[in-house]
């Protein structure tokens, strides 16, 4: 009986200690979340294309095999994306719209290097796969896919003719490579 009482007292003490630690942790302000103005290293990457889906007029995808255009047909507030080159095939409209959304949401993992002089280091010289996004106001953003990064971390990417190189995830890199298979 004495041993059971002793075990009960020890367990109760441990439980009380854990509850007090929990209360302390809950009541403490989380400085990492609430004070983001002082932390410059923590940032949420923004999408490369700052347009809404309603503002897009055309997306042109070029890879080493072929070129495909996704055209926005706008009628009374409704948008439907079509692919003229694949008009004879049964293309899923939902898949095409999802593909467009994925392109518009594409964001970098990180900036690899700014002021790059030798683009060949990143596989961004010559003919490379690209995605050009055209908007209704005549604007154009060209995303150029470079070589695969070490350790399969993703691929290098360049925007327009900037001398800045980004790293994108393998998921986004696939949008440049197998677009026609993923849409159908």
Residue ranges with predicted function:
Residues 1-184:
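A short-motif feature that recognizes glycine-rich, charge-decorated loops
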